[in-house]
Amino acid sequence: MSLPGLSTAQRFRAVAPRTPSWAYVALYSVASLDVFASDAYRSIGGGGQASARFTEAIRRRRNVYAGIERVPEVTDAGCVVLCDDMRHTWHLADCLFVPLKAAAGRRQAGATELDGEPSRRALAVIAAETVDRLNLMVTEGLAVYTPITKRYVSP
């Protein structure tokens, strides 16, 4: 995969069977919203060959959040924890949530529609061992994801 403006990409699957948000999540680091309006993005169909391998995972709901310039790598020993309900204040040992804010709201970005919801969320990358120890898989308001691909890093 090569797309100007995209620096990292990694796909994840929810750990809990009844995850409150999405069964699958893909996290990308992009330079700006202009990536989604580029000819290069349109030429790969906004998903490319990697998306063809994950057709069951793709519903084409996209959001762009500001708050992390470059999404960190998540190894097989790690998890991504998302919180879509920012009314909670999470104080968990060994877990630091980074607050994110929708960067665009609802709008068209080239061939891609961004829905802008939720307008705020938080993300943490933590050890799977910590997820188990704190029983985060069944903690209301949190969704836990494990990697299903290695992290792509643009050359």
Model-predicted segments: where are they?
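Macromolecular interaction modules
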Residues: S2-P155
